[in-house]
Amino acid sequence: VGGNDKISGGDFTATVDGQNITLGVTNNRGKIASTVDGLMMYYVKLPAGTNFTLTAKATVNSLAKNNQVSFGLMARDEMYVDTSISDPIGDYVAVGTRNQGAINCFGRKSGELYDGPAATVKYGAGDTVDLKLIGTADGFTLIYGDNETASTGFDYALTAIDSDYIYVGFYVARNANVTFSDIQLTTNGVFSASGSGLKAVWNKVKDLFPF
């Protein structure tokens, strides 16, 4: 994110309105880059090995034209809260894009960025995009809007650093403001939608990551 002095302040914002979550990053904070990442994430912690499906609609309120800007769904190996480090912050998979919409989903595998196929459909400010992330014992399936489903190469485990848990949720990086709505989470075949089940899950998330 640019150093410890860049973590706090008003450059990172998060609001919850009913079942909608709006995340925003301004002033060039955070990035998706070849050797290191900086991002804001609203997440829930799941036991490693949990089968899950997370879906949401992402409404892009604003999105800068920069190769390091990104937003979407993410599952990752480790979570660092209000922390600035110089090393890559664990492996992950992301239902999102980078390089100004050129990439259809990506991840970080063994510390290296891994890109899915080229995107054929790009999204920007004013657009709403359907996002879907599926995690099973065989790997991950990623769906970013009307682009082709990405799964090849996303079969690595997210347990190299934290072998007990994975961290699943929504993220934004570098000059993006996005509202996530119609959120649905399924774990081990037990459906939790906008009712009490999901509310309990995200209340737990709010305790882990207060605003």
Question: Residues of each region from the PLM?
Answer:
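Extracellular glycan-recognition regions
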Residues: 1-211
